[in-house]
Structure formats: structure tokens, C-alpha cells
């Protein structure tokens, strides 16, 4: 029976279908047939922690077990009532078996299942634990990614769920209005707030803005079309240079900068920076959007320049952009799996680091790094300037989301280890933070992750 099922899969491939897509389709019954001849493979962290395995209950029935429960629930995912995360994206690999030929023959004649292949992920259990514990209690997401290789070291989303009890709690999960199954790290779309100033700054420099002589006198507010735009808490920043406008996240100055920019050119820039594009990731992801038009009012244009308005971005998209700056302008393709191994530990397939594309010219990436360094040295994230073995770069953001001034809190940045020169991108977003909350939760969470990297 096992040999027959393998032939069915290969017949489908040679008939003109992709066997991978065929098996990964959750509505295809073939994967259920394969599960009768192959015991689904394990999933491991990069440091060999078991993240998912197939166990057998007292009745001899197989079930999927997740030792870390909620901690890896979104990135590893689950099977049963639907499929999510790596369990879904690598369903084909987990239901494939590259066990020894003689073992397959013996299993076929004895009616035993073949052992499925296992995934060795890029996830680091120490970094994942730090990110998970730091996010605890917040809705939002944390991503940590090696900027030079694209290897995702941690991916956490909140609220979380127990993947071991999805089937039993399916009705309750579906009735929950907080979308617990949504992986906010890849699928969440958020108003960027002041982290979008990185793109506004980039566009200003691209269009030949006067970087050296720029000066703006911030009084804490600015009028646009009869509407008042304030800096955070109405704070007056005084006379600010371009560097200090970015470091202190001066809304008024960025409104002033935005007045000089071409809407058409910033549309083109955002398109080049993957807004409105599919992201190069295996997991399901949301598509960011930049909707500013020439016909929009001056007020809408002003809001857009400091990250309010209708612009939306996912944490993974932000991570790709930041990692490109950290990597000299070139984004690496994000990856969650290092390799596939058979039950004897033999490597069947390797997923090496791959360049995705150049998003910033190297000289521009280096220049943007200096601005991001100012945020840490003396700007809005100065409390992250405390790690002996790390050079940290970043941008904070607060995006108002309702009339009560509740907001999403952001931190995007990267840290280079002074001894190893390893470079890690960090993106944090937390949802629905009450007005006046200090310190910003995203910066606090980033700090807890940085402690592990230090």
C-alpha cells in the first residue's frame, strides 16, 4: 500500500501538477492517504530543541504534539482543524520519507509506516524564549532575523493559543474576536507611525534634499489645511537639523520635509520598497499598502509623511527593509528552515542563504545607518544605548489608531555584535497601547531581546 501511494504522488507530478502544491493543499485528500503510510516528521530548532513531533496515544492513534505549546504556536503552526505555519508550508517535506530503501521494503511488507523527514529550522530557542517572554501580555509581534543570511531566529505573535488543543477548542477559537490564529508577524498590517519616517527621510535624500543645511524651528505643532498636527505630547523640539528631526522623531519637521517631496516619486519609491508586493516568505503574509495620491489634500499628505493616514505595513515587511539597510542595501530572502533531514539525521535538502534584491544603494544604506544610530545615541530610544557588545541602530514609532489616542508602539532596528560581527534585525509592534504609556512597550521588548544578543 505504501509503495502504491508513492507511485500516485509521482504520477500526479508527471501528469503536469506540482506534487508539492498538490500535497500542501489542505483540501486534497491525498495528504490524508500519505499520512497512513508515513509518520509525519519532526520539527527542530537550530539548536536541536524538539518543537513538533508525532506521538501515539493509549489506543495506538497518532497525534501531533508541540512540547513548547504557545511559545512557537504561530511560527511552527499546527495541523488538524486547518494547517498553519511551518506545518502547512512544509507539509510536503514532513510527509515525505527518505528513510533507507531496505527499511521501506520491510515496512511495506510488515504494514509499518515509514518515518517522515524532519525540518531543522533557523529558530534559536534562547532568542525565541526571550522574544516570547518579552511580548507576554501584549497583542503584537516580534521578529529577530540575521540581517546577513535572512535566517529568522525568533518569530512571536500575540495573542497566542495552545496548538495541542486546537481541535478541542475550535469553536471557542473561532468565536474569539482577537484572531488568535493570525500570525501578526507576517500577516498583521499596521499603521507604521513614525517608523515610516525612515522612508520619508530616504525619499528626501534621494530627491537631493539639503541634508547639511536643513533646519526647522519646531514649536510643538503645525497647522495644515486648518488642522493641527502635534509632535508627541505637543513637545517643542526647538531648532532641529535633519539628523535631530529623525533622532527626536519630530512630526512637525517631517511635515515640513514632506512638502518638498514629489508624490509620484515617493509612490515609485514605495513600490520599489515592496509596498503592494508579495513578500519573499514561505509563510502566509499580508501585503503592505501605500495609497497616497496627487489628488489627496495637503493634510492627508502631511499625515502620510510621518506615518499616519492609510499606509499599512507588516512586521515582516519592516524587517526586510531594515535588514537591507543593515546588510549594505541588499535584502536577503527570509528563511525559517535550514535543512530537511531523514530519520537517520542525513541531510536531504539544504536551504542556503540567498540574496533577494538590492533595495538601497550601498552609500544610501550607510547614510541611513548614521541616522538610525542617532536614535539610539541620544534620541527616542536612547535607553537602548547600554549594551557592551552591541552597536544598536533603530527607529521608534507611535501610530495613533483611534479617537481616544490609543496607539500601536513600534521599534525597528538592528544590532551588530562587536566580537562576532553578526548582525540581527529586530522588529517589534504592540497593539492598542493607552495614550501616555511610558516607556514605549516596543522599546522595552526590544531591550529584553537585545540582552540575549549582547
Question: Where do the PLM segments sit?
Answer:
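Beta-lactam-recognizing serine transpeptidase/beta-lactamase-like catalytic domain environment
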Residues: 47, 148-194, 199-430, 438
